[in-house]
């Protein structure tokens, strides 16, 4: 984000409770400041008193607050920050239950009245695969029209598999203990689905406003737990015992984390299916996986990240069986040539059986760090120019209406 702009000294005023979260954050800043290539020059000013929120609000340093970490109080932090006159850039999720969602709607209304911006940190829009897929999605001569689908056969399907314990940049990823409490972290369908729903809104309904009261229906939602033993919990958190607040989730000495879920919903007549799975750790040489399918009348777009691809995301287009091979190939070539004007690195590889790889070289794919920088620049542009489109606000509310309604539906056992 801002801290990654070169040759700039950033005074980072950090307000947080003592614990793993703030320690990991400070270690990250140190690693950026000390790296060999393009080191940053952050100057840390840290406050870790119990009244960290009140201290931040009272100090009122600057005009932007970035909120991240424990999600249980995040919506309240958003509201208090807006009351205090801050623009807010918040890490997802902005709300994890219906009560949070109600407060979030009030926060957006207050921000509007005070000419302040509230922005959700959505990095996936800056992944080049998602950008190219969005372009292809609206090439009607190639893709056709996005199918409406049905609850039993959605036209858009997204599935992701994640892991609580894994190695990142050669180091084991240490989680704070509260990460295993769905009251603090949020259920799987309230958390990682935010990126997926945002992508669907952004790709399938570009520049369109989605009103959750009239354009959205949540059809079904389910959830189920991931079992975590004390040994696994200790390995992941470096804490020897389960904290008392997790006792209600423990059965036969095993922690049950309601991290998995599926939801089915409709936006403007398009039916969408989604599934999120959290395992404790990946298999040997394994990793996180992801599948996205969007069905058009002439072709289907797929993004796949799996073992076959070395856990690297790839974009494919597959023609419908009734579309002539030569006609489709000619249209695909024509479309790619048009896109190459803006994205000259694009190419196509025939993978047989009517499937084609839209090849994007690894060196043209920005890393996750650069995605954060892109979001920060977009947000700061909106702050400076006061020109954020209204669909950003409404579509974010629609997104959290979907997730929080799904959580409540899953709890009630609706299918």
Where are these regions (language model features)?
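C-terminal helical cap and adjacent loop that interface with cofactors, partners, or active-site loops
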Residues: 191, 196, 201, 213, ...
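Single conserved hydrophobic/aromatic residue that forms the stacking wall/gate
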Residues: 2-6, 10
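Extended hydrophobic secondary-structure segments that form protein cores and membrane-embedded regions
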Residues: 11-18, 44-49, 65-68, 118-122, ...
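A contiguous active-site-proximal alpha/beta segment in oxidoreductase catalytic domains
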Residues: 95-172
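Beta-loop-alpha module in the N-terminal Rossmann-like domain of NAD(P)-dependent dehydrogenases
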Residues: 41-89, 93-110
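Rossmann-like dinucleotide-binding domain that binds NAD(P)(H)
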Residues: 169-287
């Amino acid at each position: 984000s801002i801290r990654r702009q070169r040759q700039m000294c950033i005074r980072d005023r950090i307000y947080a409770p003592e614990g793993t979260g703030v320690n990991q954050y400070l270690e990250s800043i140190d690693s950026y400041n000390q790296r060999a290539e393009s080191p940053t020059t952050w100057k840390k000013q840290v406050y870790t008193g119990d009244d960290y929120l009140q201290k931040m609000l009272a100090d009122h340093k600057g005009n932007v607050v970035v909120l991240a970490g424990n999600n249980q109080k995040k919506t309240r932090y958003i509201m208090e920050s807006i009351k205090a006159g801050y623009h807010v850039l918040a890490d997802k999720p902005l709300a994890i239950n219906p009560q949070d969602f109600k407060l979030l709607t009030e926060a957006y209304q207050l921000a509007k009245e005070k000419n302040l911006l509230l922005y959700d940190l959505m990095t996936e829009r800056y992944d080049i695969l998602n950008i190219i897929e969005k372009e292809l999605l609206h090439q009607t001569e190639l893709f056709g029209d996005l199918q409406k689908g049905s609850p039993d056969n959605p036209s858009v399907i997204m599935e992701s598999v994640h892991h609580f314990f894994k190695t990142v940049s050669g180091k084991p990823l240490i989680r704070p203990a509260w990460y295993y409490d769905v009251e603090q972290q949020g259920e799987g369908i309230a958390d990682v689905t935010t990126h997926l729903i945002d992508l669907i809104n952004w790709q399938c309904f570009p520049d369109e406003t989605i009103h959750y009261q009239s354009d959205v229906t949540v059809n079904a939602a389910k959830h189920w737990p991931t079992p975590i033993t004390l040994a696994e919990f200790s390995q992941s958190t470096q804490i020897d015992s389960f904290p008392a607040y997790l006792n209600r989730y423990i059965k036969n000495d095993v922690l049950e984390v309601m991290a998995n879920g599926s939801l089915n919903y409709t936006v403007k007549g398009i039916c969408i299916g989604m599934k999120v799975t959290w395992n404790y750790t990946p298999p040997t040489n394994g990793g996180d996986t992801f599948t996205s399918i969007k069905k058009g009348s002439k072709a289907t777009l797929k993004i796949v990240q799996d073992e076959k691809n070395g856990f690297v995301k790839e974009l494919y287009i597959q023609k419908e069986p009734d579309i002539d091979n030569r006609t489709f190939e000619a249209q695909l070539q024509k479309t790619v040539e048009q896109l190459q004007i803006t994205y000259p690195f694009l190419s196509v590889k025939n993978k047989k059986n009517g499937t084609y790889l839209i090849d994007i070289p690894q060196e043209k794919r920005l890393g996750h760090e650069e995605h954060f920088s892109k979001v920060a620049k977009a947000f700061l542009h909106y702050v400076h120019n006061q020109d954020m489109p209204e669909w950003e606000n409404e579509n974010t509310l629609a997104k959290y209406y979907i997730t929080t309604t799904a959580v409540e539906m899953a709890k009630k056992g609706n299918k």
